[in-house]
């Protein structure tokens, strides 16, 4: 799939509408647009985390793959489901979710069991991965809202992908804290120093 952008602004959205992949026009507040915009924001958050660098090139490669997947999720969410499409649309497949689950299992196997909730923080990379995780959680909620608003026209697989992705980002945020997790100490268990 080749993308050619010769001009960034078109003025076609100045009336509060935008075009979906099938060239139909919808309000910029349409649930599908909100969902793929949230995917875009999640991608930017992952990009910010990647900009810090990571000594493990495998994790960098995983995050780059996820960035590409998020573009695929956006393409899926912006392409209404129709019978017999003229061109086969780009869709999130179960294999994307399976790949995330494989990474979840592999990276989680090397981490200690949790004894409390984890606070976002620790290393800068870990903190940014937590930011990305929370944006992905919002994108997931937006994707489910799009499914609810357009039950026959939006696939559930992008929402499922985003659900699993937030799990992986949580795991990777823990991996990115080599000195250990920053754990929540409930109520009376904490004192300011």
Curated annotation (Swiss-Prot):
Catalytic activity as recorded in UniProt: 2 cob(II)yrinate a,c diamide + reduced [electron-transfer flavoprotein] + 2 ATP = 2 adenosylcob(III)yrinate a,c-diamide + 2 triphosphate + oxidized [electron-transfer flavoprotein] + 3 H(+); 2 cob(II)alamin + reduced [electron-transfer flavoprotein] + 2 ATP = 2 adenosylcob(III)alamin + 2 triphosphate + oxidized [electron-transfer flavoprotein] + 3 H(+)
Record InterPro entries: CblAdoTrfase-like, CblAdoTrfase-like_sf, PduO-typ
GO molecular function annotation: ATP binding; corrinoid adenosyltransferase activity
One of the Pfam families matching this protein, by short name: Cob_adeno_trans
Pathway assignment: Cofactor biosynthesis; adenosylcobalamin biosynthesis; adenosylcobalamin from cob(II)yrinate a,c-diamide: step 2/7
Location in or out of the cell: Cytoplasm
SUPFAM superfamilies linked: Cobalamin adenosyltransferase-like
Assigned GO CC terms: cytoplasm
Keywords, in A-Z order: ATP-binding, Cobalamin biosynthesis, Cytoplasm, Nucleotide-binding, Porphyrin biosynthesis, Transferase
Residue positions binding ATP: 10-18, 28, 137-142, 163
Matching Gene3D superfamilies: Cobalamin adenosyltransferase-like (1.20.1200.10)
Family from the record: Belongs to the Cob(I)alamin adenosyltransferase family.
PANTHER family associated with the record: CORRINOID ADENOSYLTRANSFERASE, CORRINOID ADENOSYLTRANSFERASE MMAB
Name this polypeptide is given: Corrinoid adenosyltransferase
């Amino acid at each position: 799939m080749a993308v050619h952008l010769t001009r960034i602004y078109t003025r076609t959205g100045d009336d509060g509408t935008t075009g979906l992949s099938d060239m139909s026009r919808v309000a910029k507040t349409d649930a599908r647009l909100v969902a793929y915009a949230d995917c875009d924001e999640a991608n930017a958050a992952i990009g910010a985390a990647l900009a810090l660098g990571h000594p493990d090139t495998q994790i960098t490669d995983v995050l780059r793959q996820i960035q590409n997947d998020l573009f695929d999720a956006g393409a899926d969410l912006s392409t209404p489901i129709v019978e017999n499409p003229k061109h086969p649309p780009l869709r999130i497949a179960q294999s994307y979710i399976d790949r995330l689950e494989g990474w979840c299992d592999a990276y989680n196997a090397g981490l200690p069991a949790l004894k409390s909730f984890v606070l976002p923080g620790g290393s800068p990379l870990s903190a940014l991965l937590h930011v990305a995780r929370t944006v992905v959680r919002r994108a997931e909620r937006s994707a489910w809202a799009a499914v609810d608003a357009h039950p026959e026209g939006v696939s559930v697989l992008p929402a499922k992908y985003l659900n699993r992705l937030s799990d992986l980002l949580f795991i990777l945020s823990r991996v990115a804290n080599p000195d250990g997790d920053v754990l929540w100490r409930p109520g009376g268990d904490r004192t300011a120093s």
